[in-house]
């Protein structure tokens, strides 16, 4: 099975962008949940 590297070249930046977005959104979401829990306590 031969991999077509053009597909990887096209998908790599999309995957990096999606990962970066998930990282940023995840960090903000965790911060928000922690603030909510600290406020309730």
From Swiss-Prot:
GO terms for biological process: photosynthesis. GO terms for cellular component: photosystem II; plasma membrane-derived thylakoid membrane. Keywords: Membrane, Photosynthesis, Photosystem II, Thylakoid, Transmembrane, Transmembrane helix. The chain crosses the membrane at residues 7-25. One of its GO terms (molecular function) is manganese ion binding. Pfam families: PsbY. The keyword Isomerase does not apply. It is a single-pass membrane protein. Its main location: membrane. It is found in: Cellular thylakoid membrane. InterPro entries: PSII_PsbY. PSII is composed of 1 copy each of membrane proteins PsbA, PsbB, PsbC, PsbD, PsbE, PsbF, PsbH, PsbI, PsbJ, PsbK, PsbL, PsbM, PsbT, PsbX, PsbY, PsbZ, Psb30/Ycf12, peripheral proteins PsbO, CyanoQ (PsbQ), PsbU, PsbV and a large number of cofactors. It forms dimeric complexes. Belongs to the PsbY family. Loosely associated component of the core of photosystem II (PSII), it is not always seen in crystals. PSII is a light-driven water plastoquinone oxidoreductase, using light energy to abstract electrons from H(2)O, generating a proton gradient subsequently used for ATP formation. This is Photosystem II reaction center protein Y. It comes from Nostoc sp. (strain PCC 7120 / SAG 25.82 / UTEX 2576).
